Amino acid sequence: MYSYVNLKNSTLNVLKQHNKLPSDIKWVGCTSFKIPIEEFWKLADRQYDAGYGGVEVAEDLIVVGDSWWLERHEYDGSEWWEYKELPQEPEKILSVPTLFPKGDTNYEYIRLGDFNEK
């Protein structure tokens, strides 16, 4: 099943969902180099199949703003942007005995505080 998406439009939609504007973007590229933002918009104005199958957009592509970024994610070839923010540093300091929960987690999502905070 094909699921065609325009990369430029999907980028704009994710920005809008997080109250960001295109002017909030500081740079676009990967961890090795950046590309001019205007060039990104031109290249991104293209349809691709975001559904299951092969990956079509560079997996290391990132869009970066002040303390936030968009990164590509993929599962079985299905692709999307994921919005990330630099986390706020907590005031609370806690010495923890382990980073690993005891017993079988059944692949559940386990949080550090779930088995260290009292």
Region roles according to the model:
Residues 1-118:
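Acidic interaction surfaces
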